[in-house]
Swiss-Prot record:
Residues annotated to bind ATP: 117-124
MF GO annotations: ATP binding; ATP hydrolysis activity
InterPro entries: ATPase_AFG1-like, P-loop_NTPase
Keywords noted in UniProt: ATP-binding, Nucleotide-binding
Superkingdom assignment: Eukaryota
Protein name per Swiss-Prot or TrEMBL: Putative ATPase N2B
Length: 464
């Protein structure tokens, strides 16, 4: 019998390789390979992994149509040609220029999909199912939107560093206009032209201000975007700071994505919840002993000792006092009272497979910064399929309370206003009112319910 290496040498085309690999697979391995999104959906209904849902089926049909369109698609970038001369004399004679107009040029690429609806309706499940069906698209990625934007900001920083001395217009001290999102978009599109974004949300002004130029360039490169969100595109960055500068991005998104509303009124994450729980209420049980017992069990499965650990990220040290292998035993103060951001939580989610969080208080708008960090933390851990054990002051459904509101802005909010040169009229922006946190808490509670399930705890190994 020929070895796999010899067999591969006999094959010329990618299609033949796929056929050969299928011949070498067992029927069980093939059961979910080479299926279309609709076939995969119906198979999951038949196996009772999913419950029949008319809204989900309608969205799956739209994904099926896109899947068929992408079979014969190859991206063809459309770029603006620049006519300015190069070399010494070209740079010497350059006149002072305004920033070039950034507009959609590539309208031949298939439109992607923007799937929005309430929490737990199956948006991410359907997108992941679609993604897994696209086996014959090598240049693809599935990414949480916060992680994607963290990478984008890192690439922008790198591009600016590598650019070197900036060209200046003739007889002017001003540097010539430079758009770092263009080379960043080219790098991203060269790596992946099918991009599936989970939890497309915009809460950060630094993200909001670059999305129009970034995605215009990405779409001009020919990328196809699939996104899930809890908000309609028109409601993204609602009441955000300087939203007027963000609104043009909504037009770009609507131009290149079909919008699918997906709201069946059912939160499937809460259905058939396991009897076991990894959420302990301090007033109802000896939560401290329960958490310590869980930590000892988890440590027994690690090849390490209990010790502090430091993660270095972008030149910054992030130290945790109690870890064992890939298990982190932490508390709310260590994770949410410190000024940590999305990129820090991404590092935690990628380094640890299990995180214990002690002493989570009831979260009110008096703790708005900590509330925002906790929401970001849970989103990131969920996306990385990290297992979570929590001890909290109140039951899960009471974890967020919006009855108590601060009378004055916190010091860090005042600092933000000073940095952006904002006046008192801007205090109604969502970053100050807590509107985004109020909108996001349903998703966080829903995910915490799912993260207690046995099925969730058993699947983490697949993502490592």
């Amino acid at each position: 019998m020929l070895s796999p290496k010899v067999l591969v040498r006999l094959v010329d085309s990618q299609q033949q390789i796929l056929l050969l690999s299928s011949a070498l697979c067992s029927p069980q391995q093939l059961s979910r390979r080479f299926l279309t999104p609709m076939q995969a959906y119906e198979q999951r209904i038949e196996s009772k992994e999913l419950l029949p849902d008319k809204v989900q089926k309608k969205t799956t049909q739209e994904l099926e149509d896109l899947y068929n369109t992408l079979k014969n698609y190859q991206p063809k970038p459309v770029r603006v040609e620049t006519s300015s001369g190069g070399g010494f004399f070209g740079r010497f004679m350059k006149k002072e220029q305004s920033a070039p107009k950034i507009e959609l040029l590539n309208t031949t690429a298939p439109k992607g999909m923007y799937i929005y609806g309430s929490v737990g309706g199956g948006k991410t499940t359907l997108m992941d199912m679609f993604y897994s069906c696209c086996d014959d698209i090598p240049k693809k990625q599935r990414v949480h939107f916060n992680s994607f934007m963290s990478k984008v900001h890192g690439l922008i920083h790198k591009v600016k560093q590598e650019r070197g001395p900036q060209d200046r217009a003739f007889n002017s001290e001003k540097p010539l206009p430079f758009d770092p999102t263009l080379p960043v978009a080219e790098m991203i599109a060269n790596e992946s032209w099918l991009i599936c974004f989970d939890e497309f949300q915009v809460t950060d002004i630094a993200d909001a201000m670059i999305l129009k130029s970034l995605f215009t360039h990405l779409f001009n490169e020919g990328i196809v975007c699939i996104a899930t969100s809890n908000r309609h595109p028109n409601d993204l960055y609602k009441n955000g700071l300087q939203r007027s500068n963000f609104i043009p991005f909504i037009g770009v998104l609507l131009n290149r994505c079909n919008v699918a509303a997906m709201d069946s009124g059912v939160d499937y994450r809460r259905i058939a919840q396991s009897g076991d729980t990894n959420y302990f209420v301090t007033t109802q049980t000896d939560a401290k002993s329960q958490m310590e017992r869980m930590f000892k069990i988890l440590c027994s499965q690690e090849n390490d000792i209990i010790r502090p650990r430091t993660i270095t990220h972008f030149g910054r040290d992030l130290t945790f006092q109690r870890t064992c292998g890939q298990v982190l035993d932490s508390n709310f103060e260590e994770l949410c009272n410190r000024p940590l951001g999305g990129s820090d939580y991404i590092q935690i989610g990628q380094f640890f497979h299990t995180v214990l969080i002690h002493d989570v208080p009831q979260l009110t708008l008096l703790l708005k910064s900590q509330m925002r960090r906790f929401i970001t933390l849970i989103d990131t851990l969920y996306d990385n399929r990290v297992r979570v054990v929590i001890s909290a002051e109140v039951p899960l459904d009471q974890l967020f309370s919006f009855t108590d509101k601060p009378k004055d802005l916190a010091d860090e909010q005042r600092m933000l206003m000073d940095d952006l040169k904002l006046g008192d009229t801007d205090t109604s922006a969502s970053v100050f009112t807590g509107e985004e946190e109020m909108f996001a808490f349903d998703r966080t509670i829903s995910r915490l319910y799912e993260m207690q399930k046995k099925e969730y705890w058993e699947q983490w190994a697949k993502h490592r």
